[in-house]
């Protein structure tokens, strides 16, 4: 198992500078992480810098609120892919989910999946804002919409991934859809908990610390 390929090395802070983007790109190349995950404004630059590597470019859509229109999310997705994005992490319409407007939620996801045309789409449901039944429903809608992953969190809503939520999401979607845990995964212990719960991708700014923990752990 290549643990480095579980990691989307992430920098989504609004104040991120080019120097900081360079740092996570260099780290991702050094450790051969699955991707770097950056805001759309950095996608083109990251794609150019990663062109000679296996590391993919991941970006975020409708982020962090999920409250932009479906048409806006679709355009953002198209623009990101034209700029070199390989993977798309979109935020659902959380208010629509809570209203019970499930068709709206599913159609919002479907619009992004359609524009992404074969690029990996991960759907952020923001678990910290949802109850048990809402997590289940959001996971079901993600699967029905044809997305590749259901993802826990943006990291901007006051909480992140828990192993319990990851397990619930995985139990809901089954083998056809993968689970990405993000938000608060800061060390090897957190990483292991998420993987054991069913996550096959980890979004973290602490990718280097996680890998250093793996290197220091005699079990690996």
UniProtKB/Swiss-Prot annotation:
Which Pfam families does UniProt cross-reference here? DeoC (PF01791)
Output the superkingdom of the source species: Bacteria
- Please indicate if the UniProt record lists Lyase as a keyword: yes
Task: Report the EC number(s), separated by commas if there are several.
Answer: 4.1.2.4
Checking SUPFAM superfamilies in the record gives: Aldolase
Query: So, what pathway does this thing act in?
Result: Carbohydrate degradation; 2-deoxy-D-ribose 1-phosphate degradation; D-glyceraldehyde 3-phosphate and acetaldehyde from 2-deoxy-alpha-D-ribose 1-phosphate: step 2/2
* GO cellular component entries: cytoplasm
Keywords (A to Z) from UniProt:
Cytoplasm, Lyase, Schiff base
Q: Which GO terms describe its molecular function?
A: deoxyribose-phosphate aldolase activity
Q: Where in the cell is it found?
A: Cytoplasm
Quickly give the catalysed reaction: 2-deoxy-D-ribose 5-phosphate = D-glyceraldehyde 3-phosphate + acetaldehyde
Q: What class of enzyme is it?
A: lyase
| Designated name of the protein | Deoxyribose-phosphate aldolase 1
């Amino acid at each position: 198992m290549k643990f480095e390929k579980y990691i989307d090395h992430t920098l989504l802070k609004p104040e991120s500078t080019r120097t900081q983007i360079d740092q996570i790109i260099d780290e991702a190349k050094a450790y051969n992480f699955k991707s770097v995950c950056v805001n759309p404004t950095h996608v083109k630059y990251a794609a150019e810098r990663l062109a000679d590597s296996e590391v993919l470019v991941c970006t975020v859509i409708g982020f962090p609120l999920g409250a932009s229109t479906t048409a806006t999310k679709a355009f953002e997705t198209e623009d990101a892919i034209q700029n070199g994005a390989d993977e798309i992490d979109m935020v659902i319409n959380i208010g629509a989910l809570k209203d019970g407007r499930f068709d709206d939620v599913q159609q919002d996801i479907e619009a992004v999946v359609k524009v992404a045309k074969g690029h990996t789409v991960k759907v952020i449901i923001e678990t910290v804002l949802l109850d048990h039944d809402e997590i289940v429903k959001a996971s079901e809608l993600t699967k029905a919409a044809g997305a590749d992953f259901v993802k826990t969190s943006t990291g901007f809503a006051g909480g992140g991934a828990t192993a319990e939520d990851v397990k619930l999401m995985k139990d809901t979607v089954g083998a056809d859809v993968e689970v990405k845990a993000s938000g608060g995964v800061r060390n090897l212990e957190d990483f292991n908990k998420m993987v054991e719960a069913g996550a096959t991708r980890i979004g973290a700014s602490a990718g280097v610390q996680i890998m250093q923990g793996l290197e220091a752990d005699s079990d690996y």
